[in-house]
């Protein structure tokens, strides 16, 4: 039997913020299933997230997660970490591919200043940036008019592209700690992002798209979920537009993942 690839967004997908006592039994059931499938050499697991690697580790510790996904692609999949001999190790191969083109914070600041001046708006850093980052993320608070928001953000993406930079935007998720009525603005190298990470794993393990199952809950999952034949938006998602586009999990969070992973590996989605 050929291996299957299981891909998970992290915040509000693989990890529920505000996990309570009732959720823990469902979490343990999910981990038990993933551990069994991994030990039986049936699946490869990977987390694709916009969060930093340390943030993922801290959140896993909060709920005492014991299962270790083989790969964690952090910082909007601009960094790759692999579980090896009891610890996560960053992939130098992936890093070289990501940093094959210039990616400078000074250039990104210039791009944001240009759009800020043109539309009289502000972009707020989401965290303190360090040197040589591969992911710079900002908040943009809604103007109160969706069409106006889209006009500004699409202008940002176009202008960034003109400067040979990749910018993405999606609705912020308050359940994951984001502010209400805001957008995430993400800058990454061109060789990064959840879709890029997905295709990297497909090549690495020679896995066809029909053998991949993906889960997500928000706008930065849209591109990679759209690429897959077997993709689920979490039923707990707050993105109403995406709910119209993707199949929803039967249950939220851990229960939903467990059910659909079981069905997937049992061949119920094969055709």
From Swiss-Prot:
Pfam assignment, any one: S6PP
Keyword field: Hydrolase
Protein name: Uncharacterized hydrolase SAOUHSC_02465
Organism: Staphylococcus aureus (strain NCTC 8325 / PS 47)
EC number: 3.-.-.-
Molecular-function GO term, any one: phosphatase activity
GO cellular component terms, A-Z: cytosol
NCBIfam families from the UniProt entry: HAD-SF-IIB
Entry similarity comment: Belongs to the HAD-like hydrolase superfamily.
Leading EC class: hydrolase
Superkingdom: Bacteria
């Amino acid at each position: 039997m050929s291996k299957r690839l299981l891909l998970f967004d992290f915040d509000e997908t693989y990890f529920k913020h505000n996990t309570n006592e009732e959720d823990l039994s469902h979490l343990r059931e999910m981990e038990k299933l993933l551990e069994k499938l991994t030990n039986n050499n049936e699946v490869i697991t990977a987390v694709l997230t916009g969060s930093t690697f340390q943030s993922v580790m801290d959140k896993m510790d909060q709920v005492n997660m014991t299962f270790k996904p083989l790969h964690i692609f952090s910082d909007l999949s601009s960094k790759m970490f692999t579980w090896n001999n009891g610890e996560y190790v960053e992939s130098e191969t992936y890093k070289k591919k990501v940093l094959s083109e210039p990616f400078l914070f000074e250039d990104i600041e210039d791009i944001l200043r240009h759009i800020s001046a043109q539309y009289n708006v502000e972009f707020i850093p989401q965290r303190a940036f360090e040197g040589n980052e591969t992911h710079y993320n900002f908040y943009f608070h809604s103007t109160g008019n969706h069409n106006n928001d889209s006009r500004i953000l699409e202008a940002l993406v176009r202008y960034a592209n003109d400067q040979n930079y990749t910018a993405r935007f999606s609705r912020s998720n308050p359940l994951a700690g984001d502010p209400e009525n805001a957008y995430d603005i993400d800058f990454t190298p061109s060789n990064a992002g959840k879709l890029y990470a997905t295709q990297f794993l497909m090549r690495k393990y020679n896995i066809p798209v029909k053998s991949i199952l993906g889960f997500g809950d928000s706008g930065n999952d849209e591109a990679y979920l759209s690429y897959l034949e077997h993709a689920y938006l979490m039923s707990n998602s707050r993105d109403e537009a995406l709910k119209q586009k993707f199949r929803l999990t039967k249950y939220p969070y851990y229960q939903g993942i467990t059910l659909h992973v079981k069905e997937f590996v049992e061949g119920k989605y094969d055709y």
